[in-house]
Amino acid sequence: MQTIRFEREATVGCIVLANPPFNRLDQRFSGCLREAVHEASESDIRVLVIKAEGPHFSFGGEVREWPGKDVNWFRTFVAEVNVSYRAIEALRVPTIAAVQGCAFGGGFELALSCDFIIAAENAVFRCVEVTTGMLPIAGALQRLAERVGRGRASRFAMLGEPISGALAGELGIATQVVAETEVIQTAETLAKKLAVGPTKSYAATRTLLKAWSAGGIPAADAVMLDITMDLFNTDDCTRGFLNTAEAFDLDKEPSDLIFNGR
């Protein structure tokens, strides 16, 4: 059974978690996810949506597989999950997670690997690892600290408190919170908007933010000039400058451009 698949419509790609109702991270998960990410990377998509079949985004790790395993097995399992999530972060296109129901543990971390999270009002995000004596194993703690601050990240990781869709929106974890019936449509609308945007500019923005995450403002400042200059001769930038200059000459707002991603 194919538990994760890659689909596309024109330049909008989609990775579907297809193991409902819980979409757990079992032993097959990382390999299937990496394969789907590679398919996305090798295609000419300009945006990627990650969504799930069934009532829940993902309940996280399939803990029933873990008892009786040794530490070397668990280390490899955790490493493979992290590699698959970092592969998503390494893509050169914007990424969107469409989350309904529960996003627990590794499911929460999968959503946090994306640039945008569209959350249903019934969504519940939770770092459940503390209930097993573990901590978030695929990057939730540090990514939460980056988004909501160290204090809140400690609270959510150490106390395992659930985060409602509404609270996720208030804290900036979720980009937008909508009715459950509107999650996919909202994510697809955002994806279509990004798919006709300046793709290289989006990739550069992601690169600069990664530099900031790694080394703060000094690290981002150190690479910002080169990243900016790489955009200067792109077709999108050339057309964008011209469109804006012409609008200024006519004393009006620049018209919306359909960028070609080059």
Predicted stretch roles:
Residues 1-9, 19, 160-165, 185, ...:
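C-terminal alpha-helix plus adjacent terminal tail
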Residues 29-33, 77-80, 183, 224:
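Hydrophobic alpha-helical membrane-association signature
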Residues 15, 50, 62, 110-112, ...:
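Hydrophobic/aromatic residues within transmembrane alpha-helices
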Residues 1-53, 86:
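Conserved CoA-thioester-binding segment of acyl-CoA-metabolizing enzymes
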Residues 32, 52-87, 103, 133:
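Glycine- (often His-adjacent) and acidic-residue-rich active-site loop
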Residues 87-199:
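Crotonase-fold acyl-CoA enzyme core
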Residues 22-23, 56, 134, 176:
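Short strand->helix junction
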